[in-house]
Amino acid sequence: MEINAAIESLTSITDLDPTAVCDDHPNIYLRATMDGALGVMSHIKPVLSETVTTALEDDTVVSSRYAIVTAPPRYKIVEQPYTDADKGYLRGLRTPEACIMYMHYINKIISHAPANPLVRDAVQSMNLNLGLHRDMILGSYSVDDIYTRLDPVAPQIVLGGALYRILHSRNALYPKCAIGVVGPFNQWVDTAQPAGPCATPEVNDILNVAREYELPQRVVADLLIEWVLETSVPIPRGTRNRITLELQKALATHLPAGLFHDIVIVGLGIGLPPRAVSGLEEKMGIDLFWKTQNSYHGRDSVSFRGALENAAVRDCSVITSATGKTAPVTTFGLVTVRTNPPFPKLSKLVTYAPHPPITRSPFLCARVRDVYDQEIEVPHGRASGPRHFSPRMVVLRERAASVPVLTNTLHEHSFSRGYFIPIFLREYKSIYAFWSTLGLPSRSHPLYIFHVLSRSNIRTLETIPDPVPFHPKERVFMGQCLAFYVRETGEELYALKIFRLVMERGVLPMYARGDSAPVQILGFIVNICAALLAFDDTDGLDSLDMDTYDELSALGRVVWYVWLLTTLFPLYMTTATEPEFLDPMFEGTYRLGEWNYVTTTGALYPGDNIERLSVSVDYGALDEKTKGFGETLNIPVHVIGIVNQFIFPILSAQLPYAFRRLPNKSVVRHPIDMIEAVRRKLSERFGSCVNPPYVGPITPSASVPTGKYIHVMKHPEAYPEYTVEASNGTDGDSLSDDSDDESAEPTSTPASWIGDRDEKVRLEARLREMEATVRNDLLIGGRFTHTGPPVIRQPVPRAFPKVDVSLMAEAEKRSGDMLKRLDDVYDLVAKTTHMVETGGMFPVTDLETLPPPPADLLQTSVDSESRSIAPGADPVSHDLDKLDLPPAAYEEPDLPLDLPPAAYEELDLPLDLPPGAYEEPDLPRDLPPGAYEEPDLPPDLPRDLPPAAYEEPDLPPDLPRDLPPAAYEEPAPRAESSEDSTGTTGADGSLPVVSPPEPMSAPGGEPATGTTGVRGFKSERLILPRKIMSSIPRPSDALKERLSTRRTQMYDSGSDSESDSSEYDNSDSDDGRTERATSSTLDDEVERMTHSFNEWVRISTNPVATISDIPPALDPPSDSIGSPGEGAAEEVQLGADPGGDHTRAPPVADLRGAELDRYLYKESESLISVIDELFTEYVTTPAAPPSGPVVTPPVADNGGTRETHPREKCPYTVAEKYRILYTYGEQDELAALVESTGAGTDVERRVSARVLANVPVSSAVIINESLEEDQFTRLENTLYSMGLKRVYIPGDGNCLYNTLRFIAGADGESAIDFKKELLDDIRKYVRNQDPAERDLILTEIDNLAGPNVYGSGDLISFFQLLRGVGVTVVSWDKIGGRLVKLVATNQEGIPPEYIILFTNSHYEPLVTEDTMIPDSYLKDFIEWKRSLFLSAII
């Protein structure tokens, strides 16, 4: 077995799609939280939770923290099952034990990072080279606490076997990465045939000057590179070879920065096509990097950390002229580089935005927008133009680059004598010209020169290296080691495995393809340790005859050395013999203490103890001795020094669990036993936790619960597939045999233990079943899905105290009685509703015989004065609550009944809709008005129905039942309109309107004022919206600060008769306030629209209208629709004369029945009403006021009239059509009306027939038709009472985008532009998610991006996530007359913004009344209203 096969025995890396992202390289993206950056792996469910702490914690082992620990960013090891059930446990690891072992090794290494510069650089390099730039925005760490914030290091190692698959699939991940892609330039130089001396004078002059002045070789290489790029004549072969040899000399000690001229530099030359100033681009790149290289050469990790904290490009020296002089340039945004000829100004080619560094480079801190990466296909031979890329189109891993960074630490400790951040080249555009000019092979890219020369004995990439000779000294030493191992352990088969592993040809692709030596070595050591302990290939192993081998693999010696330290060193400590051949390597490097008996650490069964020796190792002495032994092993000293830094932490983790005691001697455990020891130690910590680990293998049908620990086998007999290897591989001498310290190698577990264990399994299973039953009882309980009587579940045997049977029976009886009485009440409501809907009469006998609502049904704490539920009172309280029943003694039945209305007051839900409608994320259905108010009510319907018929459980008891319907309606008139009214008896005999009760208590305990509800009629239900919204905070101060100080003052106190003529007054307000538009923008808009209609608008200066059964909003001014001579009541009309005397509304007492009802809805006009009247009056007002009685034209046969009025000019047709779209246009209705051919709606036909035939209509119909208008009036009043107002948004299909635009403060953008920007941001955000989920989201986004497509609720969620704001959506419950919270954001620290949703089809922002709203929103709304009106009259 070769090394590759050994690693593959632990990893699932076969048959991967080379075009897909590697399985072992999960997509890690950042999710912003209030505390920091939360890293999320987007593959699937986590198997390891982030709460894992310390695996091994005792006196001899340094306490280590797991990679999945507390500080952000947190990472979770995730699992995606293969289609084949035989593969994969974790992606990249086969078993939980292997994962524990990996994590244990990795964390022991990382725990030494503060004192181990090589490990520290490996961690830094891992984070840099993998391009996880987003993980560093909020998760940066210093080298001092590197072991507590591992960022993406440990998951990459664990999932991929230390980057084995990540780096092996480098071609798939980074298609144009120079490292590991091109061939060895150095080998070509060695084999190139010279073609004579150099005959080029310029080149000879450069070389002569270099010799004369003893110039450094890097300066020589720089001069030669400049000459090659500037020359325009062919270069002879001899000259090319001489230049190549000089480059080889320079690259042997230093990598000239000029060779990196394809890298992104501030504003210069990236991605230019070959025909575009290619020569200048090459020279600029070379000089620029040459001048800046020294600034970053030799930085150590500490100073390097300081440079990483800068998030913008700073102090960049750029070349400004052909002389090579430089000038500092500091930039923080769009780069403008001023250059002198012959360098052109290139600032238009590349746009930079200040961003955190994409590779943590202290030099490059910019995000690239390349304009020449792709060119538009040119039609008809025209010149092509640059194509600008949006940020979401830039794939950073393919387009990013950085400067080389050399550190002193790696100069001293690594193979490379320096390392650099990987250079991501896309097409080698510039270097190709230079390389082709020299005639060098296409696979000899200069970046690889440094790679090859700095990798010691690793010489190739694409091919397996040739084996090295197996020297006699090595043969003897290896034979002694194997013989010693077999003699001490008796494990000849394992010795054969190790021998063949070392002998086989092979090299880890990871080891040669890495971007820095520390990362390679870290992964290499961990993988080799795992392979040495767990690989199980035994094919072809039949002897230990070393004479059959003359060669060993190129890395065999390093593998052998790792095996010596991890396996033979513990054996050497405890052996009774004296292996003299190992004394020079291990003698005097350790000290053993006395036996330390550990009786219960990790024991799963009685007697299964983990015993260990107290071992103290002098790692300094061990390092010196192993380096001195390097000659025997034929391993370079510096290689031993590097490997020791990674092996020693692993050794310290293994040694305490590497021994077991026998009666006469102590022996080293089998390597599998070491893993078992670690696993058992973990089981003590996690085996009996509240959140138990996931149990079972991963198969396509398995479902791994979220947030579970990795499986620590609690009952191995249930999973023999994971224990057969441990038991068989050790020939019965496994860890479970350590049951008795004094026993002589027991081979089996005693039967008594097995019996106790089986009994324990049964008891635990029984307890789990009982706990599940209890949970199910709590979850299933309720009465929403069951129609029968209460179901008594038979008691389940459990370890709970028994419940008194009499108590159970009593509780059952009381519950059944309560539910029955609830059924009677709701049957009454249902029967009443049915009679109203069908138009039938409600039998008087039913009213007499039906039982009244039980007094104790809703026991609430009621204030004696306000009759409202006192704050803090339990809305549903009964004696049954006092009975503390066991959770699962019986199952409460599920009945299809709704809770009493009072039960929902604490839930902020409407009374008439079940809670299920609001528990789902979808928005609730808004039932049509006709379902609750039927226009064709029978005239003789009794007015004295019980309160339940009106669904008003909280009406004051002293309110007469025979009040007109207005007594039960909301909103009510304002205080000024009714406070002087004494309430006279109407002509129809109705009782006078009672005086309003005393002010009610607000939820906070303060007395309600006039602003608590609509002034005038103090109704309890008017207090309800404020009670509901009292807990909702006002919009954030940030939103108020964002808005302009120029406020459009909609309401001015008092009526100013000397106001400007461009202002319009609306004297229809009861409280005498005048509504004006004072903004200059609004004035201009109103004046322009008024001028357009000045030929049509005729408004009487003394308007008097007759109150009839036609809704007031639709009455034509100065025209009566009722019979001539009918008694008139004054109605306020819009006056053309600002100084005119506007008649105030009549007292409330003068109105009766439907008139009172309509007046209650006719509250102070809002801005919408003003705008509506501006558009509708020209239609509803005739050309001249009628001078005499209205003449009724003859009625035609078809119900119409013989009058020749054109139907399309009927004023009420237009008015009704417009009123259907009263405040917001439901898009479907608007589209239907715009496309209408004039047939009209049913409302149009009925209203037109009434007007032309002069037919009286009942008041019930009038109320129903004006319901939409009334509802908006009620909503406006409710918002006003809470100090809120709407931001009027057009209902043109973009209402959601306009609403979010307002919240985001994007006042200068149009809704279309904001929509495009938001959808683009969502596309970028989901780019790194799981492909299946990402495709679904992108498909939905593409659908939303189409024209005339409304926004969806998902956009609100993404908007909150991307913009860092909370959005709370509320809706208007037309039946309950209150606001209902639908979707709320409860993230702590995020200020909420409020949106109101109308009938699931229109969104508008809600702001405080003093919020300044930009003029642009009002202007857009007026324009939309005007277009809507024009579409209605066409």
From Swiss-Prot:
Residues 734-744, 1055-1069 have a biased composition (Acidic residues). SUPFAM superfamilies: Cysteine proteinases. Residues 1183-1192 have a biased composition (Pro residues). Residues 896-915, 1002-1012 have a biased composition (Low complexity). Residues 1284-1409 form the OTU domain. It comes from the Viruses. Residues 724-753, 848-1087, 1111-1148, 1182-1207 are annotated as: Disordered. InterPro entries: OTU_dom, Papain-like_cys_pep_sf. This is Uncharacterized protein ORF65. It comes from Ictalurid herpesvirus 1 (strain Auburn) (IcHV-1). The lineage of its organism: Viruses, Duplodnaviria, Heunggongvirae, Peploviricota, Herviviricetes.
